UniProtKB/Swiss-Prot annotation:
This is Shikimate dehydrogenase (NADP(+)). Belongs to the shikimate dehydrogenase family. The gene is aroE. It catalyses: shikimate + NADP(+) = 3-dehydroshikimate + NADPH + H(+). NCBIfam families: aroE, PRK00258.3-3. Keywords: Amino-acid biosynthesis, Aromatic amino acid biosynthesis, NADP, Oxidoreductase.
């Protein structure tokens, strides 16, 4: 990267903590190099306490854009000037665009688009399908919105945090009003309802942190009877590449198991396009992500 840094180089950032596991710097910097773009992507260890100062830094330094990850995806909302329609609906942001570097910051959410492109890449269509989705944080809400926009027949949402259920219910109401998709919300602690939903679903999506450290030995599904030859299981965790859930689903004969690497690639590609105006060369970037 040092060979192409100059006084004209445009900076893009990542604001999150922890950041050491992130694949984004490698992906974006390789894409800049492939396309000959004079950009550089740097990750900054920023939590909610430092977030306001970091956002002001984007404005002051003319940083052209930033990716935003945990724990900042919702906390950044009041610090921005505008939101895309999807980001406003989801109530979370993972990409900030500073158009022309002039300090007007617009928040976008690309998680949902990334997830659906990853599924399509694996030959999985969501149109007219019944889908169970566990975990309705920033990423989960974005995926739910995109599933509804892309024509899912029914989305059964499950979430463990009772304090979040009321805010998610507002999203459920909006999706039922704006789309033809039937969307419901239940507590993940209700295992009877959870198991029934999976039995009736074509696709199960785990958008929780279960499966990644320190929860790498846990799985939301432990009953082999829930895994069927016509069930697709998608875990948005990408480290480890095969979570306990995916290993269990593979062992018991799921139609297909998909990890989060494809979602990382395609949400990154969408963010790349928003910030640079160029298409990320995804075929060249895929090998950097390792085995899917």
């Amino acid at each position: 990267m040092s060979e192409r840094l100059s006084g004209h180089t445009l900076l893009v950032s990542l604001l999150a903590t922890p950041i050491r596991h992130s694949l984004s710097p490698k992906m974006h910097n390789e894409a800049y190099a492939k396309l000959g773009l004079d950009y550089a992507y740097l990750a900054f260890e920023v939590g909610t306490e430092q977030l306001a100062d970091a956002v002001q830094g984007i404005r002051a330094l003319g940083i052209r854009g930033s990716n935003v990850s945990m724990p900042n995806k919702e906390a950044i909302l009041p610090l921005l000037d505008d939101l895309s329609p999807a980001a406003e609906l989801v109530g979370a942001v993972n990409t900030v665009v500073n158009k022309d570097g002039k300090g007007h910051l617009v928040g976008h959410i690309t998680d949902g688009i990334g997830a659906l492109r990853a599924l399509a890449d694996e030959g999985v269509s969501v149109k007219n399908k019944i889908i169970t989705l566990a975990g309705v944080g920033g990423a989960g809400k974005a995926i739910a919105v995109q599933l509804a926009f892309d024509g899912a027949k029914e989305i059964r949402l499950f979430n463990r945090q009772a304090t979040r259920l009321s805010s998610v219910q507002k999203l459920v109401t909006k999706l039922n009003q704006l789309t033809r998709t039937k969307v419901t919300l239940q507590d993940l602690e209700d295992q009877t309802a959870f198991k029934e939903a999976i039995r009736e679903s074509h696709l199960f999506i785990d958008a929780t942190s279960v499966g990644m450290k320190p929860l790498e030995n846990l799985s939301l599904i432990t009953d082999p009877e829930l895994i069927r030859p016509d069930l697709v299981v998608f875990d948005i965790v990408y480290s480890p590449a095969e979570t306990k859930l995916l290993a269990f689903a593979r062992q018991h004969g799921a139609q297909k198991v998909i990890n989060g690497l494809g979602m990382v690639l395609y949400q990154g590609a969408e963010a790349f396009k928003l910030i640079t105006g160029q298409d990320m060369p995804v075929d060249a970037i895929k090998p950097l992500l390792g085995d899917k």
